Amino acid sequence: AAAVVALNQTTGDEVWRSLTDRGQYSSPVLVKQNGADVLICWTGDGVAGLNPKTGTPYWQHPFKPTRMPIGVATPVVHGNKIFLTSFYDGAMMLEMSETSMDVKQLWHLIGPNERKTEGLHSIISTPIWIGDYLYGVDSYGELRCLRASDGKRIWEDLSAVERQRWATIHFVANGSNTWMLNEQGELMIGKLTQAGLEGTSRETILTPDQMRTPNRKGGVVWSHPAFANRCVFLRNDRELICIDL
């Protein structure tokens, strides 16, 4: 067993396997560190920077879950910084060394539980990094702005998505605007700044899927939108739609 496996994209043959960590849902990210390609993988036990050709770890940093491996968000890389957010285990900022193949922790904020949170306790949504600030959705739908240098909360907005456990917004940057699809199927266009969520237009474009849970009677849209050729592509469990923008 292995947490990460590389396959030949033409034949599907296995090229290498790496790490004995538990797996989870987060996608790997390919970045540069000191001129070398590094595959950043957030596993069920920590974060690793791998040589993408061989799978050999350049570095590893622990981020063990207090309950279960449940990370879905993709690691957010900005320069030599790596930001991670977990529903139960809060937010962590790492820094990749610019002189060696190493990494160090800058800060880690975690609240006492999923309702009393510090930093950002996100489950599905990948945050977005703009300038010196991070924006993401906390455990019960709180849209938050954090100062990237130390994780301090700058503001919180409760209007972007309904207050529910695991509430989700997908963020896509487009120039000075951010396009946001919330789990009610509403597409929002606005500006995320340290002053707040500004100038938001909002329209329901996809019907949420029903879930067999008491707190989700209205359903959810958890699939990420895709943007291409001035169109947005969206899906639920019943249909795939394309909307001209």
Predicted features and spans:
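Noncatalytic, solvent-exposed loop/strand surfaces
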Residues: 1-245
